[in-house]
A protein has these predicted regions:
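Conserved catalytic core of the tyrosine transesterase superfamily
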Residues: 1-174
Length: 174
């Protein structure tokens, strides 16, 4: 059922992962106080305790608000100390990395995707789709929180493959 408190939470998680490119630890420790939806951004504390601001799209915002209003209110009642953590498990605690992995695999399987799907694939898709859409590599580096641009350049190989395919398909002497 797509309307259970867990299904709504899980959809919100999947939307946030794809919309923002967060690392799994950043996602599981995301705080409500760091959601700045009036400006379409979220504040992230990333690796090395570095802060960054990441834009977040309306679809993800809608699902997060739905989760907060329809699901989280029940989960937070069981919380002992995590009242600011956004995504909670059935005990009211922050989700574990493993729980997010299992949830990702579950929905991939339900969607008929049998290849190896894991949370980082959403971060990879986020970066790849931005670059394929023409985003500046430096801007993508900032959004991902990479200290070194060479780490971000890993995502450009897909873009190169795409460019080769376009060239092969459309250039008369390819």
């Amino acid at each position: 059922d797509k309307n259970t408190k867990y299904a709504i939470r899980d959809r919100a998680i999947l939307e946030v992962m794809y919309a923002s490119g967060l690392r799994i630890t950043e996602l599981r420790l995301l705080k409500i106080s760091n959601l700045i939806f009036d400006y379409d951004i979220i504040r992230i504390i990333g690796k090395g305790n570095k802060e960054r601001i990441v834009p977040i799209g309306k679809t993800a915002q809608i699902w997060v608000e739905k989760y907060r209003k329809e699901s989280r209110i029940y989960l937070v009642k069981k919380s002992k100390e995590n009242d600011d953590i956004l995504f909670l498990n059935s005990s009211g605690s922050a989700l574990s990395r493993n729980a997010i992995w299992e949830m990702t695999k579950k929905y991939a399987s339900l969607a008929g995707i049998n290849s190896n799907v894991y949370p980082h694939i959403f971060r990879h898709s986020f970066a790849t789709h931005l670059l394929e859409g023409g985003a500046d590599l430096r801007a993508v580096q900032e959004m991902l929180g990479h200290a070194d641009i060479s780490t971000t350049q890993i995502y450009t190989h897909v873009n190169r493959d795409y460019l080769k395919e376009v060239h092969k398909s459309y250039h008369p002497r390819a």
